[in-house]
Amino acid sequence: MTPLYFLNKYLKDYKVVRIGISGLSPLTHYRFGQCIKEAVGDKNVLLIASGDLSHRLKEDGPYGYKEEGPLFDHDIITAWKNSDFMRFLTFDPIFTEAAAECGLRSFQIMAGALDQKKIKPHYYSYEGPFGVGYGICGFEICGEDQTRDIGNQYKKKMQEEVKKIKEHEDDYVRLARTTIEHYVKEKVEIIPEVTKEMKRRAGVFVSIHEEGRLRGCIGTFMPVQDNIALEIVHNAISACSEDPRFDPITEEELDNLIISVDVLGEIEPVEDISTLDPHIYGIIVSHGSKRGLLLPSLEGVDTVTD
């Protein structure tokens, strides 16, 4: 609540609306900021986007050092100075997690609240003496600027990237995408065409990402359907509608989704972890009645120890 300490020095009669952030996507936070803008109208309002920057600037800091820490803070300060709000939306989530930041979503909401506004930045300071980054920058509204519809520009850019990816999808991914799109729109399971490659049985995982973030992932260690095609259909529906970590995918999200399908090979025992390569092999770990699986080539998993 540091900003309120200074605010109270100059203002005595004001009301505060405290808003929490979420684990939702950058664009969702931006849209929320636009809702704030609409609700505020022409009222006299000060929006404080509060939050620390990286917590990993020094070895002797509370969270240690990661090279992503100083890089994140540098990018944020540069974005502030240049009023580059698009940068708030385009950080790689693996990168920001490594940087251990906590202010980015507040900045995304602020950017949405200033949508299509002509702004002038007032950069004041940055420091990180204790291993945590602290910065101060204000933005003055100087009029309207229709070219600063950052949210729409970001959405268009994201959908263009997804379109390019879709052009190179294989039969497995196309089946998963068709299944998801049909189920989300119609709530009906499709009857798949079973190609020669999909006639055999195998475990399958279907993963869904949106804006670089996991949006759903469900799979089977061992086959439970008559063929791979049916395995994909059932797991695609579960991934988009039954993953307990996420809300069901909506029709508005369909154009933003990146989908992957992993068809599991034969399970083999591991005699020596030195034979493992996380970029080639997945791994199943069992303990008592519990069992977990890591797919190969996961973001943020670069070594066997990871």
Enumerate the predicted regions with their spans.
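Short, acidic Gly/Pro/Ser/Thr-rich loop/turn segments
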Residues: 55-56, 144-146, 268, 292
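A glycine-rich, aromatic-flanked flexible loop/lid motif
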Residues: 50-51, 81-85, 150-151, 203-214
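Flexible, D/E/H-enriched segments
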Residues: 1-34, 60-171, 248, 252, ...
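Short gly/pro-enriched beta-turn/loop segments at secondary-structure junctions
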Residues: 11-14, 40-44, 50-51, 132, ...
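Short, electropositive, low-hydrophobicity segments enriched in small/polar residues
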Residues: 55-56, 107, 137, 220-223, ...
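Active-site beta-strand/loop microenvironment that shapes enzyme catalytic pockets
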Residues: 20-72, 208-228
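Structural signal for hydrophobic packing residues in well-ordered secondary-structure cores
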Residues: 40, 80, 84, 114-118, ...
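Basic nucleic-acid-binding interfaces
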Residues: 155-306
